[in-house]
């Protein structure tokens, strides 16, 4: 079949069929694990246009990509995002168009996104305490985010997932409450080990690190966790709750249980660099290809294919010590 002959296969025989695209580096939050408080954002001419983003998505889908996730920054602060979603969702062969959001704009955009063809949402929620939420996000309004979560449910989204970055001494005492919140709303929830991207001064990452094993052990004191073989085509490993049929608990463990052996994804930064690995700087400048050869999908396809030999077998994140990756998560696509 043509699809198989055109599929993207890396040097370790991993099929690449999942693309994460950052549509903006801007965000209305300043989460302490994601960016510096005085973050300087890119000039608009340095980021990909909506048309350029669509051209990359179109080419990846033609090459066998079955899942695309739009990220940021906060993707919903990018003007024209709903129209972009509609165009990407309509690409023949794409099975899932997902979007990761901080939830702040979902009150007004959940229904338009659903109508445009977005299939699933991931929503960040690191605390259920309004003051602590404000401390962790620096600018966020918890009530507004919860209203956005509820708007997503009302719009018709199913299998919506909450994402929580666990920081020891900051929000790790809320784990059970967060799971109960997810159960009440029939949501999935994933607990994430903090990733060492960008130099931050707000906290020491080694001291705040909380492993997925520790999180799971604490949850097991309150819930019956049943390991699941289900997959979302991403890095999360899921467990079912015997007490709640409509909620799964996931763990993303870049430090304690890295997911590199089955990695099926690449990332496009807002500047148009195709990152072959979250934890390495190997990349190819697709913006240059798009602008040097406008309207030439063959040149874009060649650049994508040629990039695959740069994809390493694994990352080498470390809990403590110097930061290995200087770019912040909002530049990479969270």
Curated annotation (Swiss-Prot):
Q: Which family does it belong to?
A: Belongs to the radical SAM superfamily. MoaA family.
The residue ranges of the Radical SAM core domain are 11-236
For the ligand (GTP), the binding residues are: 20, 69, 100, 161, 265-267
- What cofactors are annotated for this protein? [4Fe-4S] cluster
Per UniProt, where does S-adenosyl-L-methionine bind? 33, 73, 124, 195
UniProtKB keywords: 4Fe-4S, GTP-binding, Iron, Iron-sulfur, Lyase, Metal-binding, Molybdenum cofactor biosynthesis, Nucleotide-binding, S-adenosyl-L-methionine
From the broadest rank down, the organism's phylogenetic lineage runs:
Bacteria, Pseudomonadati, Pseudomonadota, Gammaproteobacteria, Pseudomonadales
A single Gene Ontology MF term assigned here is: S-adenosyl-L-methionine binding
Which EC number(s) are documented for this chain?
Answer: 4.1.99.22
**Source organism:** Pseudomonas putida (strain ATCC 700007 / DSM 6899 / JCM 31910 / BCRC 17059 / LMG 24140 / F1)
**Annotated catalysed reactions:** GTP + AH2 + S-adenosyl-L-methionine = (8S)-3',8-cyclo-7,8-dihydroguanosine 5'-triphosphate + 5'-deoxyadenosine + L-methionine + A + H(+)
Name the gene that codes for it.
Answer: moaA
Q: What is the name of the protein in this document?
A: GTP 3',8-cyclase
Quote the cofactor binding remark: Binds 2 [4Fe-4S] clusters. Binds 1 [4Fe-4S] cluster coordinated with 3 cysteines and an exchangeable S-adenosyl-L-methionine and 1 [4Fe-4S] cluster coordinated with 3 cysteines and the GTP-derived substrate.
Q: Which NCBIfam families match?
A: moaA (TIGR02666)
Give the top-level enzyme category: lyase
Q: Which domain of life is it from?
A: Bacteria
Physiological role: Catalyzes the cyclization of GTP to (8S)-3',8-cyclo-7,8-dihydroguanosine 5'-triphosphate.
UniProt: [4Fe-4S] cluster 2 binding residues: 260, 263, 277
GO BP, one annotated term: Mo-molybdopterin cofactor biosynthetic process
The UniProt entry, under InterPro entries, shows: Aldolase_TIM, Elp3/MiaA/NifB-like_rSAM, MoaA, MoaA_NifB_PqqE_Fe-S-bd_CS, MoaA_twitch, MoCo_biosynth_MoaA/MoaC, rSAM
Question: Quaternary state and partners of this protein?
Answer: Monomer and homodimer.
